[in-house]
Amino acid sequence: MEEALAGHAGDAGTRRPRARPRRRVSVIGVIGELLITAGVITLLYVVWQLWVGDLIYGAERNATGHELSESWALEYPLPTASAAPDDTEAPDEPVTAEPVILAEPADGQEFGVMHIPRFGDDYAVPMAGGVTRETTLDPIGIGHYPGTSMPGEEGNFAVAAHRTTWGKPFNRIADLRVGDAIVVETQEGWFTYRFRTLEYVTPDSVEVLLPVPQELNVPPTTRYITMTSCSPMYSMTERIVAYGVFEAFTPRTAGAPAALTEAAA
């Protein structure tokens, strides 16, 4: 009996544990994991592009715009007052002059800064020639349609910018109200336009760029501004178009116009 028990115990001690079956790695499983990883990376990129990146790009655009304004202010300092003004005199009227028309800029060449009080006190987006993404819209901000008028010139001064991504300069274009100031600053001074109306068109509606928007073969007698961007948000199926009319040109020697500091009602 004891030998029998010993024999069984010896057999039990020499037994090896069964090896667990190896998990087979299937091709479908690998593909699934790769797709999940790619999806996470894509999601992170979208979050960066639409939110985090926009905040960074927007701040950079405004900083560059303010730097341009400051550099022009240093080049054209305001004249020093020779005497204190007489309190009995009526306040001075805003100083305006005949607009100084710039030459059309080359693709990607900066020429101005756009200020829109409705969009905030710090809104100061650089403007450059051309409307290509690679040269102007992505790296700079607002682009001028080649062949259209320049600021203050009779006809249609037409510009474009992103509504989403890359700092989204025209993100709030639909918030404009009748009478809102749209101020274009150049080294010569400030061109003030007043917003009039919005329109939604198809992407091929190039008539909005005519000297008189939407009017073929009509000679211009007014100075317009036309701002275009994609619509609806995150889509390119339509274009949103904002129109404005010219109000005044303020030479740099006269100081910034009051329109720049208007409170958005």
Language-model-detected regions and their locations in the chain:
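Solvent-exposed, non-transmembrane regions of membrane-associated and secreted proteins
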Residues: 23-24, 29-30, 37-265
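Terminal targeting segments of Actinobacterial cell-envelope proteins
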Residues: 1-28, 78
